């Protein structure tokens, strides 16, 4: 029995990045031998075991053979005679196919270290094409390692394009696609995930609502980048700079889906695009079982981002109605999320990346003033029943109006 550290831990140590998880591969062992040493088996499809003390994962070396469509259509051989190189051969990228023994010796049969140094994401073998999930994984790695200068090898992109055209992506479950989407949103450059999917043709298959934005023009006066799809990825890039909150990043990604529904005769204008996008957002979220928190914020941002952009022109009563509709009184954190998404939208335009966004502080001032209105004072003044709500709203409008007057 021989044990090797494999995959991400070896890769990240070579990149001098923090190591999150350590995965081990065991060569020359049987499940019975592992169990006899106190390991606990957890893998159903192939033998994976938890170490009795560290709870880290130890997988028997294995080979895989394609038997059906989709990422799960494989038969697995985890016999004791499977070699280290055979196991590494089945892995997706060369940078993930490096092993290290307990003496620190590295085994790199597919030149992963050279590709790490060259900042290349390259597939290990043509078996890459057998697993459609790898399209999403490579796009995610491209986003994760974008700041380090990584690019996708041309021959790997060609295979990703072939997979996208094959119909295999449709075999992926919604849960698997969403897991990769959410992981990509966590990266420093989530926009790269979607630009890679666009380049290889996977965006049109998996996220047609986003793909439909490319080629849709916007008014050049406000959007020098013109293209709605380009704008969307610029907004996501800005959202990642402004916030680590994946809900904010997701809302920023889908805030303009309605622009794809604008009548051709009205282009490049997009009247009511925020409201037109609401059914598209609901459908996308239902399809991928997106968490309710993400969905609700995305709907709010799509519905209200134009109002926030025009905040200084809104009447005081309109601002209070916005606060009521969004239930900011009970969910004040949602206001912060909305404003961050709107700021990302404003900055996600060519030449506007460093522009201030005074609307955010203005709306925050309005909300603070309105929040300071005391319900107790209204009740103590003798108001009862429905009058309390009416007077509360009236007092909040007056408080916001005072903020407006002070700014004029």
UniProtKB/Swiss-Prot annotation:
Cofactor note: Magnesium is required for nucleotidyltransferase activity.
Cofactor needs: Mg(2+); Ni(2+)
List of residues binding CTP: 8, 11, 91, 137, 140
Binding site for ATP: 8, 11, 91, 137, 140
Signal sequence interval, chain numbering: none
SUPFAM superfamilies: Nucleotidyltransferase, Poly A polymerase C-terminal region-like
UniProt binding sites for Mg(2+): 21, 23
Record-listed E.C. numbers: 2.7.7.72, 3.1.3.-, 3.1.4.-
Reactions catalysed: a tRNA precursor + 2 CTP + ATP = a tRNA with a 3' CCA end + 3 diphosphate; a tRNA with a 3' CCA end + 2 CTP + ATP = a tRNA with a 3' CCACCA end + 3 diphosphate
GO function terms (MF aspect): ATP binding; CCA tRNA nucleotidyltransferase activity; cyclic-nucleotide phosphodiesterase activity; magnesium ion binding; phosphatase activity; tRNA binding
Residues in HD domain copies: 228-329
GO-annotated biological processes: RNA repair; tRNA 3'-terminal CCA addition
Domain of life: Bacteria
Gene3D superfamilies: Beta Polymerase, domain 2, cca-adding enzyme, domain 2
Key words of the record: ATP-binding, Hydrolase, Magnesium, Metal-binding, Multifunctional enzyme, Nickel, Nucleotide-binding, Nucleotidyltransferase, RNA repair, RNA-binding, Transferase, tRNA processing
Subunit details: Monomer. Can also form homodimers and oligomers.
Extra facts: A single active site specifically recognizes both ATP and CTP and is responsible for their addition.
Domain notes: Comprises two domains: an N-terminal domain containing the nucleotidyltransferase activity and a C-terminal HD domain associated with both phosphodiesterase and phosphatase activities.
Functional note: Catalyzes the addition and repair of the essential 3'-terminal CCA sequence in tRNAs without using a nucleic acid template. Adds these three nucleotides in the order of C, C, and A to the tRNA nucleotide-73, using CTP and ATP as substrates and producing inorganic pyrophosphate. tRNA 3'-terminal CCA addition is required both for tRNA processing and repair. Also involved in tRNA surveillance by mediating tandem CCA addition to generate a CCACCA at the 3' terminus of unstable tRNAs. While stable tRNAs receive only 3'-terminal CCA, unstable tRNAs are marked with CCACCA and rapidly degraded.
HAMAP family: CCA_bact_type1, CCA_bact_type2
Family as reported in the entry's similarity comment: Belongs to the tRNA nucleotidyltransferase/poly(A) polymerase family. Bacterial CCA-adding enzyme type 1 subfamily.
Protein known as: Multifunctional CCA protein
């Amino acid at each position: 029995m021989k044990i090797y550290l494999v995959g991400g831990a070896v890769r990240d140590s070579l990149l001098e990045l923090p190591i999150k998880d350590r995965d081990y591969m065991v060569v020359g062992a049987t499940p019975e031998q592992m169990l006899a040493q106190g390991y606990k088996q957890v893998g159903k499809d192939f033998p994976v075991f938890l170490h009795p003390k560290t709870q880290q994962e130890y997988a028997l070396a294995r080979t895989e053979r394609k038997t059906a469509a989709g990422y799960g259509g494989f038969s697995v051989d985890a016999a004791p005679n499977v070699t280290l190189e055979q196991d590494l051969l089945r892995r997706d990228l060369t940078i993930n196919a490096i092993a290290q023994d307990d003496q620190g010796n590295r085994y790199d049969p597919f030149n992963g270290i050279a590709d790490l140094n060259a900042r290349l994401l390259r597939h290990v073998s043509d078996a890459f094409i057998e697993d459609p999930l790898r399209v999403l994984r490579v796009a995610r790695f491209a986003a994760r390692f974008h700041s380090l200068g990584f690019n996708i090898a041309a021959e790997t992109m060609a295979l990703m394009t072939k997979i996208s055209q094959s119909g295999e992506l449709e075999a992926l479950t919604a849960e698997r696609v969403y897991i990769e989407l959410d992981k990509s949103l966590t990266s420093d450059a989530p926009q790269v995930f979607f630009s890679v999917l666009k380049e290889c043709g996977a965006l049109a298959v998996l996220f047609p609502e986003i793909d439909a934005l490319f080629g849709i023009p916007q008014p050049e006066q406000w959007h020098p980048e013109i293209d709605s799809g380009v704008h969307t990825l610029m907004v996501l890039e800005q959202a990642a700079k402004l916030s680590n909150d994946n809900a904010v990043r997701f809302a920023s990604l889908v805030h303009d889906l309605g622009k794809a529904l604008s009548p051709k005769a009205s282009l490049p204008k997009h009247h009511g695009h925020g409201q037109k996008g609401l059914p598209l957002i609901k459908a996308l979220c239902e399809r991928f079982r997106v968490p309710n928190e993400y969905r609700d914020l995305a709907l709010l941002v799509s519905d209200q981002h134009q109002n926030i952009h025009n905040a200084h022109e809104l009447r005081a009563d309109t601002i209070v109605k916005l606060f009521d509709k969004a239930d900011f009184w009970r969910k004040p954190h949602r206001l912060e999320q909305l404003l961050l998404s709107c700021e990302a939208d404003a900055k996600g335009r060519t030449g506007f990346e460093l522009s201030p966004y005074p609307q955010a502080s203005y709306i925050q001032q309005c909300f603070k003033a309105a929040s300071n209105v005391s319900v107790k004072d209204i009740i103590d003044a003798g108001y009862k029943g429905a009058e309390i709500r009416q007077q509360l709203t009236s007092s909040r409008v007056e408080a916001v109006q005072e903020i407006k007057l002070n700014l004029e």
